[in-house]
């Protein structure tokens, strides 16, 4: 009953232009390089984050830098950013501070990425295709701001904007999930729809520019 009431309230107060959909089995396709194509995601709950787990799946053949997930506040453009600097080199930014994870032999094809971070220890953990990549430490004691713009397809150099086409994502993204706590990545189901901040089966979003929603291949 509580979940049903929450769903009704969310639908009643959706920002103008936003929609909520069950996107299971669907993907966002970003067909070409641009600084105008992106998807804005609205969290189901707005709260400061002292820990999180972020998971998503993506496919691209880009070899240049690109953004996978951009969470920006008015004080920190890279409050939370998952960024690929080059093939096999993944950057996690927390509060404008970054750590880099290197994958010796990155696979060609779709990747399933999960990253978690907790403020109490500052430890960030990255997994790729259900295998651990490593752990790094950053921003111990930090709290992510709650009033954020969350964007797929572009990297925010200012709050909600200042996009650079040369950092845009070209390809497909799906199954984006964000929790407000650390999930055991070792036991995380390959396709999991239990996340409480961003949930792919009840995603609130708005697509701008050349973005297409299609069934997953």
UniProtKB/Swiss-Prot annotation:
Q: Does the keyword Calcium apply?
A: yes
Main site of residence? Answer: secreted
Residue numbers binding Ca(2+) 1: 77-78, 155-157
Q: Which SUPFAM superfamilies does the protein's record reference?
A: Concanavalin A-like lectins/glucanases (SSF49899)
Q: Name one GO cellular component term.
A: extracellular space
* Leader sequence residues: 1-19
Question: Could you identify this protein by its name?
Answer: Mucosal pentraxin
- Its gene name is MPTX
């Amino acid at each position: 009953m509580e979940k049903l009431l929450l769903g009704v309230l969310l639908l009643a107060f959706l920002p103008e232009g936003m929609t909520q959909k069950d996107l299971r089995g669907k993907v966002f396709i970003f067909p070409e390089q641009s600084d105008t194509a992106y998807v804005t995601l609205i969290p189901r709950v707005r709260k400061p984050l002292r820990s999180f787990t972020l998971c998503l799946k993506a496919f691209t053949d880009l070899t240049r830098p690109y953004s996978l997930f951009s969470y920006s506040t008015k004080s920190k453009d890279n409050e939370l950013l998952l960024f690929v600097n080059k093939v096999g080199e993944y950057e996690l930014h927390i509060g404008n501070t970054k750590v880099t994870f290197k994958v010796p032999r990155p696979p060609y094809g779709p990747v399933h990425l999960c990253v978690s971070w907790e403020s109490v220890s500052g430890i960030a953990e990255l997994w790729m295709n259900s295998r651990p990549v490593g752990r790094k430490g950053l921003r111990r004691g930090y709290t992510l701001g709650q009033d954020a713009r969350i964007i797929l397809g572009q990297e925010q150099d200012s709050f909600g904007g200042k996009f650079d086409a040369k950092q845009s994502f070209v390809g497909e993204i799906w199954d984006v999930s964000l929790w407000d706590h650390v999930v055991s990545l070792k036991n995380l189901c390959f396709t999991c729809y239990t996340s409480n901040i961003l949930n792919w089966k009840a995603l609130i979003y708005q697509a701008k520019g050349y973005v297409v929603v299609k069934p997953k291949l």
